[in-house]
């Protein structure tokens, strides 16, 4: 059996945010020293009431990676429908490298309409079917980014690379795995 700590950072007393982060760090360090298997951080936005006050589990994970040695670092969860999938894939991969392979990935579609409509109108919770399609497509892109050295994607919400982008970069010559060398049009990303 493994034990993980769900670090649902709340701020009912409306303390200064830096104090809340210091408490979260103390919990993280305690869990690592006490040999918990993992710690999980949440993602929520616009919570004026003090509930679920951590907006970026990946940034908190970077902080945890710098302060701990053994504990696995998870997100409960990354609301992937709110974020650009390429950026999300890069950020999670970078955290995994910085933590020396200690990342646990948790993903979700979101739960609060006030978050979705303000962070990505395509993720509006009023249209659950559309939100689920966005979730599936975003997850597909994340998996491609992590598994394939070069890839492309054309979907309902995202197209990578951007259509008809002509490679023009003096410091980086075109690469046949990314660019059609006859047209210089970018066909894959990496």
Language model segments and positions:
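Glycine-rich "substrate-gating" loop/helix at the edge of Rossmann-like oxidoreductase active sites
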Residues: 48-53, 78-83, 127-130
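Active-site mouth loops of central-metabolism enzymes
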Residues: 9-21, 78-86, 190
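Short Asp/Glu-rich motifs
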Residues: 15, 50-51, 84-85, 114-117
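N-terminal beta1-alpha1-beta2 module of alpha/beta enzyme domains
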Residues: 1-72
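Internal, glycine-rich beta/alpha segment that forms the wall or movable "lid"
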Residues: 87-190
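Active-site-proximal loop/turn and secondary-structure-junction residues that shape catalytic pockets
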Residues: 9-11, 45-46, 79-81, 109-113, ...
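Structural beta-sheet core signal
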Residues: 5, 75, 105-107
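Outer membrane beta-barrel
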Residues: 71-74, 80, 88-92
